């Protein structure tokens, strides 16, 4: 397997997540969920800025007008970077105060797919929602525990999804026009010693790059054969998500976490919570934006 080199950004997130590449700003965004922080890192200048919110901030992605779309606790909002104005768009599970949003992505039609979990990680307490132009969340999957990574194939016929504790990446038939999904098969089974699958993205060859929580790296899986192709080894245990970006879409930004590490482990793995940049030999696709 290839050996990768990385550079790190000293973010020191408690729970770094949701990397997103903004083409117009030529910068990476990510969040520190529990601390409500939004990071922006300009790739050319190397400058990082941080904005803080009085909520758990679980997701950042792009809106159709250049604004950001944020998931805060159980609500979705648009955020104007120039005015710093936050506008609430929709909400889920107001009857479940222990729940919060987690990972999310937009499909090729601009619909937002976003999951929930219980902050107590209660089995079966999470769901996956689809949010379209009418801003009404529609439940697509339930009985989830940690709704997590998602990706679509280039032909928009397959949707990949991770419910982390299952240690599986599931493939669903995807109907682009309607946004309907139907379970097809388990594409990848992840063995215990490799940790838990967390966030993921897909490259132009259709391979899945998956952050392994407790697995010290990002693993590249072939979802057709279920085989592990390669691994980006990182000097931290808890790797949480990854996204392609950069001018050639060949730079992988990887988020990590300090949570669930003891003081001794944090001394042993001092870069835990930092963000890593890795140049790959493949490319990703520009992320879809939320159309509403």
Q: What are the residue ranges of the model-derived segments?
A:
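Beta-rich, blade/repeat-based domains predominating
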Residues: 11-25, 54-69, 95-111, 140-158, ...
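Hydrophobic alpha-helical segments and helix pairs
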Residues: 85-142
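A short loop-to-beta-strand structural motif that recurs across blades of beta-propeller domains
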Residues: 37-39, 75-77, 126-129, 168-170, ...
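Conserved beta-strand positions in repeat-built beta-propeller and related beta-rich domains
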Residues: 22-23, 28-33, 69-74, 112-122, ...
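Blade-level signature of beta-propeller repeat domains, shared across WD40, Kelch, NHL, RCC1
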Residues: 243-292
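Hydrophobic/aromatic beta-strand positions that recur at structurally equivalent sites within the blades
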Residues: 31, 41, 79-81, 129-131, ...
